[in-house]
Swiss-Prot record:
Family annotation (PANTHER family): GATOR COMPLEX PROTEIN WDR24
Zn finger (RING-type) location: 1274-1316
Name of the protein: Restriction of telomere capping protein 1
Assigned keywords, A-Z: Metal-binding, Repeat, Vacuole, WD repeat, Zinc, Zinc-finger
UniProt-listed GO biological process terms: positive regulation of macroautophagy; positive regulation of TORC1 signaling
SMART domains per UniProt: WD40
Regions of compositional bias (Polar residues) in chain numbering: 7-18, 593-611, 898-917, 1010-1022, 1035-1051
Species assigned in the record: Kluyveromyces lactis (strain ATCC 8585 / CBS 2359 / DSM 70799 / NBRC 1267 / NRRL Y-1140 / WM37)
InterPro entries for the chain: WD40/YVTN_repeat-like_dom_sf, WD40_repeat_CS, WD40_repeat_dom_sf, WD40_rpt, WDR24, WDR59_RTC1-like_RING_Znf, Znf_RING
Ranges of biased composition (kind: Basic and acidic residues): 81-91
Residue ranges that the Swiss-Prot or TrEMBL entry lists as coiled coil: none
CDD domains in alphabetical order: mRING-H2-C3H3C2_Mio-like
Molecular function GO terms recorded: zinc ion binding
């Protein structure tokens, strides 16, 4: 012993070493290289050294500290000494207060099994591996573990005599088979160790024979025919050894016989062909407080098998299994008996640990004297018989099930006396690369008590005492842990949480739980089946499924508590939401069980008396409510204690509340199917995913002469029920700004274009006689081709808009059917914005065609005035309302046609002496086709273009005055006079330009806008044409103009008569126009107009250059006119203003809102429909969204919707990922091996290279190279299926497609060709 504070030394095979400072050592192991440091772990004040070797892993409780040093780690072996380091108290307190790691040693050889030597004073372990069988001792004072002897490692001298191992002798290692299990004997045979493995023999070693001259092998038992998986010594009759292996036989050997037969067992039990994974004697620990005594436990043993069976036997009747239980759905891998009660816990590949009661129901076993198996009468004990499979009841249910989600490798009860079996602890280890040793309390099956993390997956462990566990891992390290010093998992878990359930759940879950512990409340629990009603303990630390295990479901005397807390629970106002799901516990939805044998229905007798049905058939839901609802009846009101788990189905609750409040309002009878659909959020999602339109095919849009009309239901909502509902809810479309658009005659683009060809300005018949020059004709021919291409593009855009409008209206109808008004209005907003775009696009197309027909064909100018087209009137009214600055229609826009004189009266110009040449108006107007939205500046441009056309018409209509030639001097004088008058008029008018006319009286220029309406209008030709009265600006437009431009409200009323598309001087009543007018009144000297001819020339030159309105006229000799400058400034303001109904702006905002609110369907619909048009997000985001949405559709089994989405997906990398080829591995029907057929493929390829071109026809996957057999033949023709084949699901028989087609269709058969009794069709 060492004193505190004194120097410590370490003894080793090489001597003693002084204490070393903290440092890192380079240590080699069989699997990796790592750095390790050893130091005191700090339990109390006792100095000791330790600890296990850990890699810096997130699973281990050790990690690198802030200084870069490794946590408490060491690497010890038999040949290497270990330096010790004891940290100071202060440094230790900063690092860790306690942990449970006590011992650690790196063995350096492969190990696979461990057991303790059943001699308390020896403190030894036996560890076995493929080439290692060693005895290890540990010291609790020094906290060290040492290898004492390796029975498989010896040294030979020259004389051939084997001596103890020495460093001077050459070492040899004896190898045995892979060890499956190692066990040590008890009492008189405590020096015996049995090992078994992949060989067919069990080797018995005497651990006391450690000298070289002694042979430690006592005997070798080899009656098994296949590898042995498990061996075990009997604790009472210590000479009895039991073994079980892959041959399905259980062998019992008696080691007391003086001449042991190594090839014949004393008892042999044949369980058939079912392999045995584990076999154990029932333990007989001598606990001081055990009142039952040893009784007859030593006669009992049990085994688990590959089929999942658990069998219990009695040695006195080995030909009959006392218990036969279907314990697991897959192979059962391990079992262990409770230390003193009739319980067995089993583990399997299905990841479940199941607790089974295997005691006698009467609890009174006959006192039969012990049967002594000795050599005096060996034949009487050689019982070889097969147990009858039908005699034992296999229908049993576990007392408790712990789900670990990993295949169980080892599990063992803690060897401690527990009055209540549910206070017992079990240690488990699993298969896999991420497996630790987990310690569970049966009172808390969902949360382990301790998780012992090691540097590598565990391969075996053993309980030394109540608190100490020794573990070996795949890094060949043995580690000892004291679980009493280990923190529990519960210490690091939150005690309350709130989570969203998945889409198939209840929406939201509240969980509040007190910390609790790992012990059950009840101190005593009677043995199941004792005939007495057991107490039914229920602790807040346990789930309802765990509570079920206390109630003894197999006891028919258990009565159900009819006044259960479940009824009061449903009436509790705070928990009343559970009533939303009648038949479910706490509102949790029912689930289906996959395996009938895994059900937790040991309360089945009490279920019948329950008014609720049991939706659960399996306890294997890692949830507090995973048990049967009958548990609510079997317990008292303590069920309402912690943990509280409340599930709320928010959509269902809100829909119920809303439907209740709107019941009187709706007053309509809905179908049961619709009501059921609305009550389930999942079904609503599926319904919307199926019904909503997410895309449209661009290929379907073709240019046709007759066009395609928009569905009337998508434009004016002809359904009366929908209209009435909208009006009741205040959602009527009569107040929308597209209301007037919807009731036009047609939205077809072709019709609109034809109507847009109508001219609105009266001209004389002489316009048809205009002669065109050859140069202008050639230029206009090229312009006609460009115009045709642009018109074709506009037609495609128009039909795309019509398609999108139809889809928006369709989606809106889907939402209105579900009474989802918010999403309904969203789709209406998008539809209306697209209708506005459609109107603007068709207007621009109409203007283009108007200009073409004006220039090319003047003969049809009289026809439009014979019609009164509403759409043309709307177009005309819209351009007239540009003066208001408010983009909406008013009721006065639809004015009737009356007989009236021409709106404009122009003085006859005397200086127009010749017919002007045809201008490049068509080319100048091409810029208007590039935009899809007509702003106020665009309307100004169109109006000025029409003014130029009117000036030309006036020149033609006054062609008789052109004969009066005026020489250049007279023209110069007149221009100077006109310039002077224009300047004076510009000062007075500040905005308007009046074209003078030569008259007998004084030259009359229009003095002000107010005089325009009162001035007498003179017709432009002798004939008075009847034309529609120009639309007047409505009161609403005037009112909005005043709101938007308060400074100009006093002149708007006077300018009302001039705000029209046909006006040669359009009015500007906005605040910007007012500001510019006042600015230009100060600089009027720079805004002179010389004559009407120059007005036309200047405007034409501006349009021809196609420059922005911010630029100036290219002519250096001509100053900028007042209108041009005003239009330039107005265009600047218009470029910075986006109307609120802009489809790009509106849809982008709606998309952002849907993303923020988590509306998946709306987000994807907007993204898929409008991404190409408006570029809402980047391409990568679109691809990710489509991929995630497709995965979501697959989760809801909406495969047809996902397939349609992928079919129309424009991104090949997304569509090809789901529609590409998939690799499917085929297996042979006979040998179950993969069908690779590489050998035959090489042979056939070689034949083809040699010249046999038809050799490849023999290759295929209809045969197997491994077993040289053909696969399943056709059930009709009995030939190999080399081509397309189909399978019948009822019976599983397969056949050629053509053969079965002939059988079922041609011969009209309805059964399988092989005569299966089931009718297929």
């Amino acid at each position: 012993m060492f004193k505190r504070g004194s120097n410590r030394a370490t003894s080793s095979s090489q001597g003693q070493q002084p204490e070393n400072p903290p440092s890192l050592k380079y240590q080699s192991s069989s699997s990796r290289y790592s750095f390790h440091r050893q130091y005191n772990t700090g339990f109390g004040t006792s100095p000791f050294r330790i600890s296990p070797k850990y890699k810096p892993d997130s699973r281990t409780p050790f990690s690198f500290d802030g200084t870069g040093n490794v946590g408490p780690e060491s690497s010890l072996n038999e040949e290497e000494s270990n330096a010790r380091w004891r940290p100071s108290e202060s440094s230790f307190d900063k690092r860790r207060t306690f942990h449970g790691a006590k011992y650690s040693l790196s063995i350096g050889k492969e190990v696979s099994s461990i057991d303790k030597i059943n001699s308390p004073e020896s403190r030894s372990l036996i560890i076995a591996g493929k080439s290692h069988l060693g005895i290890y001792t540990f010291d609790e004072d020094s906290k060290t573990i040492t290898n004492v002897h390796d029975f498989l490692q010896t040294a030979k001298t020259n004389t051939g005599i084997t001596k103890n191992t020495s460093s001077t002798l050459r070492r040899t290692t004896k190898k045995i088979s892979t060890i499956s299990d190692v066990k040590a004997g008890f009492y008189n045979h405590k020096n015996y160790v049995a090992i078994c493995g992949t060989s067919t023999s069990v080797a018995i070693y005497d651990i006391n024979k450690t000298s070289a001259i002694d042979n430690p092998v006592v005997t070798s038992l080899s009656e098994h025919t296949r590898s042995i998986n498990s061996v075990d010594f009997n604790m009472v009759q210590t000479s009895l050894l039991i073994s079980g292996g892959q041959d399905g036989c259980i062998k019992i050997w008696d080691l007391r016989s003086p001449k042991i037969s190594t090839t014949r067992s004393d008892v042999s039990i044949n369980t058939g062909s079912d392999s045995i994974r584990d076999v154990k004697w029932m333990p007989s620990y001598e606990f001081s407080n055990d009142t039952n005594g040893l009784s007859n436990r030593h006669f009992k043993f049990a085994s688990v098998h590959d089929s999942g069976l658990l069998l219990k036997f009695d040695l006195r009747q080995p030909n009959q299994a006392e218990k036969k239980i279907n314990a697991h759905s897959g192979p059962a891998l391990c079992l262990n008996w409770h230390p003193h009660q009739d319980y067995i816990i089993s583990g399997g590949r299905d990841g479940k640990c199941c607790l089974w009661y295997v005691g006698d129901k009467s609890n009174q076993v006959g006192n039969i004297s012990s049967t002594n198996l000795n050599s005096s009468n060996p034949a009487t004990h050689n019982l070889s018989s097969s147990y009858p499979l039908g005699l034992s009841n296999t229908l049993a249910f576990p007392e408790l099930t712990i789900n670990t989600a990993r295949s169980m490798n080892k599990l063992k009860f803690r060897p401690k006396y527990e009055t209540n079996v549910f206070n017992s602890l079990i240690g488990t280890s699993s298969m896999g690369e991420d497996s630790d040793v987990s310690v569970y309390s049966l009172a808390r099956k969902y949360i382990p008590k301790n998780v012992i993390a090691s540097s590598a997956p565990s391969v075996g462990f053993v309980w030394w005492d109540d608190d100490t566990i020794f573990n070996i891992d795949k890094q060949n390290t043995v580690t000892g842990w004291d679980i009493s010093h280990e923190p529990t998992v519960l210490d690091n878990l939150p005690k309350n949480t709130i989570k969203w359930r998945d889409l198939d759940g209840d929406g939201i879950l509240f969980l509040d739980q007190k910390p609790g512990g790992y012990l059950s409340q009840e101190e005593t629990v009677l043995t199941p089946g004792s005939g007495e009603n057991r107490k039914m303990p229920f602790t807040h630390r346990m789930s309802s499924a765990t509570a079920n295990s206390f109630t003894g479901g197999n006891n028919p005397n258990i009565t159900s508590n009819t006044s259960s807390s479940a009824a009061s629970f449903s009436k509790n106002p705070t928990l009343g939401m559970s009533q939303l799901h009648q038949g479910n516990v706490l509102g949790e939805r029912s689930t289906m069980s996959k395996h009938a044998q895994s059900v937790n229905s040991k309360f089945s007798p009490s279920v019948n008396s329950s008014p609720w049905t049991n939706p659960y058939s399996s306890p294997h839901h890692n949830s507090i409510v995973s048990g049967s609802e009958s548990a609510l009846h079997a317990v008292n009101d303590s069920f309402l204690q912690s943990p509280y788990l409340i599930g709320l189905d928010f959509p269902h609750i809100l829909n119920t509340i809303r439907n209740t409040r709107l019941a009187e309002f709706n007053r309509k009878v809905e179908s049961a199917a619709l009501l059921e659909l609305k009550s389930s959020p999942t079904e609503v999602f599926k319904f919307l995913a199926r019904e909503l339109k997410f895309s449209y095919k661009y290929n379907s849009i073709e240019t046709k002469d007759n066009g395609r009309e928009l569905d009337s239901s998508s434009t004016h909502g002809s359904v009366d029920s929908k209209t009435n509902l909208m009006e009741k809810l205040g959602l009527s479309e009569n107040n929308t700004w597209t209301h007037l658009i919807k009731y036009t005659k047609s939205h077809d683009s072709d019709e609109v274009i034809s109507k847009g060809t109508e001219l609105k300005t009266p001209v004389s018949d002489k316009s048809a006689n205009i002669e065109k020059s050859a140069t202008n004709h050639k230029a206009e021919t090229n312009q006609d081709e460009n115009s045709s291409c642009i018109n074709s593009s506009n037609q495609v855009k128009t039909k795309n808009l019509i398609e999108l409008i139809t889809l928006c209206d369709k989606n809106a109808e889907i939402y209105i059917m579900l009474e989802d008004f918010s999403n309904y209005k969203i789709w209406l907003l998008m539809r209306d914005s697209l209708l506005w775009d459609l109107k603007v696009l068709t207007e621009s197309m109409a203007v283009d065609v108007t200009a073409d027909q004006e220039v090319n064909d003047q003969s049809s100018i009289d026809q439009p005035w014979k019609k009164n087209d509403s759409f043309t009137s709307l177009k005309e009214a819209r351009q007239a309302s540009v003066a208001s600055g408010y983009s909406s229609y008013s009721a006065t826009d639809l004015s009737s046609s009356v007989n009236t004189n021409n709106r404009h009266s122009f003085n006859e110009p005397t200086h127009l002496t010749q017919t002007p040449p045809v201008s490049h108006l068509k080319a100048q107007l091409q810029g208007s086709k590039e935009t899809t939205t007509i702003s106020r500046a665009d309307s100004i441009q169109n109006s000025l273009q029409n003014d130029i056309i009117e000036i030309r018409k006036l020149r033609q209509s006054h062609g008789d005055r052109a004969e009066l030639a005026i020489d250049e001097e007279e023209e110069g004088e007149e221009r100077e006079e006109l310039t002077k008058r224009a300047f004076e008029e510009d000062e007075n008018n500040k905005q308007f330009i009046n074209i003078p006319r030569r008259e007998s009286g004084p030259s009359a220029l229009m003095p002000s806008p107010s005089h325009v309406s009162s001035q007498s209008e003179i017709p432009s030709n002798p004939e008075n044409h009847h034309q529609p009265r120009r639309p007047r600006t409505s009161f609403i437009d005037s009112f909005m103009s005043q709101l938007r431009s308060p400074g100009s409200s006093n002149v708007d009323a006077d300018r009302e008569s001039t705000g029209s598309k046909k006006s040669s001087m359009p009015s500007f009543s906005s605040s910007a126009a007012t500001f510019l007018n006042s600015k230009k009144s100060q600089n009027a000297n720079h805004n002179k107009l010389k004559s009407a001819t120059e007005v036309s020339d200047i405007l034409e030159s501006e349009f021809a250059t196609q420059k922005s309105w911010n630029g100036s006229v290219a002519k250096t000799t001509t100053q900028m006119s007042g209108i041009t400058a005003l239009m330039n400034e107005t265009k600047k303001l218009e470029n910075t203003i986006t109307p609120p109904w802009s489809s790009r702006r509106l849809i982008h905002q709606l998309y952002e809102q849907s993303v923020a609110s988590g509306n998946i369907l709306l987000t994807m619909a907007i993204l898929l429909l409008f991404q190409d048009m408006f570029q809402l997000v980047d391409t990568e985001t679109v691809k990710n969204s489509i991929a995630e949405f497709t995965e979501l559709l697959h989760r809801y089994e909406l495969f047809e919707i996902a397939a349609e989405l992928m079919k129309n997906c424009p991104y090949e990398d997304i569509s090809s990922s789901s529609a590409g080829f998939s690799s499917i591995q085929l297996f042979c029907d006979k040998c179950n091996k993969p069908l690779v057929n590489e050998s035959s493929k090489e042979k056939i390829i070689k034949e083809r290279l040699e010249g046999n071109s038809s050799a490849m026809s023999r290759f295929g996957y209809w045969y197997c190279d491994s077993c040289s057999k053909r696969n399943t033949l056709c059930c009709f023709c009995n030939k190999p299926m080399k081509s397309l084949a189909i399978s019948m699901l009822n019976c599983g028989h397969e056949g050629h497609f053509e053969c079965l087609k002939k059988w079922f269709f041609d011969e009209n058969m309805d059964v399988c060709p092989l005569g299966c009794p089931a009718i297929l069709f």
